[in-house]
Swiss-Prot record:
This is NADH-ubiquinone oxidoreductase chain 1. GO terms for molecular function: NADH dehydrogenase (ubiquinone) activity. It comes from Triticum aestivum (Wheat). GO terms for cellular component: mitochondrial inner membrane. The chain crosses the membrane at residues 5-25, 40-60, 79-99, 105-125, 151-171, 177-197, 237-257, 263-283. Keywords: Electron transport, Membrane, Mitochondrion, Mitochondrion inner membrane, NAD, Respiratory chain, Translocase, Transmembrane, Transmembrane helix, Transport, Ubiquinone. It is a multi-pass membrane protein. Belongs to the complex I subunit 1 family. Disulfide bonds: none annotated.
Length: 325
C-alpha cells in the first residue's frame, strides 16, 4: 500500500481540475461541430482561454442564498459533492504502481463513494426550500439508486473473472484479452448506467430545464454553482476511467508491438479515457432526453434483469472450465 503525501495529492488534483476545465471547452466545441457552429473562439486562440474566463466570471459573482434556505446545509452541499468526486481518485491507478492508495477493496471503495454522491444533491434540494430544487433532488436519488443495482451486478461479473477488488489486479488480468471483448454487452450496459449515474444526457432528468428550471441547483450562483459543475465533470472523468480499467485494459497498450511499448502507459490510459469522454459528449449531442417513466423502466425492467442474467452464464462458464481465479 502506498502512503500519500501532499505533493502526490497535489499532482493528482491539479491535472484533474485542468482536465475538467478543458473538458467543458471540448464539450462545447464538439456540440458546436455537431450543430454546425463554431463554438467559443473569441477568448484566446481557438477559445482555449474560455474556461479561465468562465471561472473568473463565476468567482466574481455574488453568492446569493434564499432567505428561507438552511444556510449551513445550503453552503455545504456543493462542497460535499465536489470533495466526493475528488477523493474517489485515490484508488485509481494510471500505471502499475502509479496510484495514491492501492487498496485491495478499491472497486468497493469507488462503488461506495459514487453512491454517497447522491447525498449532496438531496441536501442541496432540501436546504434550498424550493419545490423545483427538491423535485430535481428526488429524481436524482431515485435515478441513481435504480441504476446502482445494475452497476453492482455488472461489477460482480467482472469480479468473477478476476477474483479481486484490486483495480491494478483487474487490469493485469486483461493482459491476454480485454474484458470489453467477451463482455461487450456488459460494457454497453455499464456505460449507459454510468450516463444515468452521473445525471448526463439523455438521462439528465434531475436538471431538466423545461420542467424544473435547472433542477437541484436552481438556487445556486457563484462558486456554489461552479462546485456542482466541477463535481459533475469530475465524475464523468472518473466513470470513464472506471470503464477503461474494467473493460479496456486500463494502461495496457492497444497492440503488443515494440513501438506501442515505447509510449508511457499513463498515455494509453488517458487515450482510452478520452474515448469514453467523447462518447459522453456525442450521446448528449445525438439523443433527446428520456421521459422519467422511460428512464426508470429502462433501469428496472431492462438493465436489472439483463445484468442479473449475465452473472449466471459467466459464473457457469468459469466453474465448468475451471477458470475461477
Amino acid at each position: 500500500m502506498y502512503i500519500a503525501v501532499p505533493a502526490e495529492i497535489l499532482c493528482l488534483i491539479l491535472p484533474l481540475l485542468l482536465g475538467v476545465a478543458f473538458l467543458v471547452l471540448a464539450e462545447r466545441k464538439v456540440m458546436a461541430f455537431v450543430q454546425r457552429r463554431k463554438g467559443p473562439d473569441v477568448v484566446g486562440s481557438f477559445g482555449l482561454l474560455q474556461p479561465l474566463a468562465d471561472g473568473l466570471k463565476l468567482i466574481l459573482k455574488e453568492p446569493i442564498s434564499p432567505s428561507s434556505a438552511n444556510f449551513f446545509l445550503f453552503r455545504m452541499a456543493p462542497v460535499a459533492t465536489f470533495m466526493l468526486s475528488l477523493v474517489a481518485w485515490a484508488v485509481v491507478p494510471f500505471d502499475y504502481g502509479m496510484v495514491l492508495s492501492d487498496l485491495n477493496i478499491g472497486l468497493l471503495y469507488l462503488f461506495a463513494i459514487s453512491s454517497l454522491g447522491v447525498y449532496g444533491i438531496i441536501i442541496a434540494g432540501w436546504s434550498s426550500n424550493s419545490k423545483y430544487a427538491f423535485l430535481g433532488a428526488l429524481r436524482s436519488a431515485a435515478q441513481m439508486v435504480s441504476y446502482e443495482v445494475s452497476i453492482g451486478l455488472i461489477l460482480i461479473t467482472v469480479l468473477i473473472c478476476v477474483g479481486s477488488c484490486n483495480l491494478s489486479e483487474i487490469v493485469m488480468a486483461q493482459k491476454q484479452i480485454w474484458f470489453g471483448i467477451p463482455l461487450f454487452p456488459v460494457l454497453v450496459m455499464f456505460f449507459i448506467s454510468c450516463l444515468a449515474e452521473t445525471n448526463r444526457a439523455p438521462f439528465d432528468l434531475p436538471e431538466a430545464e423545461a420542467e424544473l428550471v435547472a433542477g437541484y441547483n436552481v438556487e445556486y450562483s457563484s462558486m456554489g454553482f461552479a462546485l456542482f459543475f466541477l463535481g459533475e465533470y469530475a465524475n464523468m472523468i472518473l466513470m470513464s476511467g472506471l470503464c477503461t480499467l474494467l473493460f479496456l485494459g486500463g494502461w495496457l497498450p492497444i497492440l503488443d508491438l515494440p513501438i506501442s511499448k515505447k509510449i508511457p502507459c499513463s498515455i494509453w490510459f488517458s487515450i482510452k479515457v478520452l474515448l469514453f469522454l467523447f462518447l459522453y459528449i456525442w450521446v448528449r449531442a445525438a439523443f433527446p432526453r428520456y421521459r422519467y417513466d422511460q428512464l426508470m423502466g429502462l433501469g428496472r425492467k431492462v438493465f436489472l434483469p439483463l445484468s442479473l442474467a449475465r452473472v449466471v452464464p459467466v459464473s457457469g462458464v468459469s466453474v465448468t472450465f475451471r477458470w475461477l481465479p
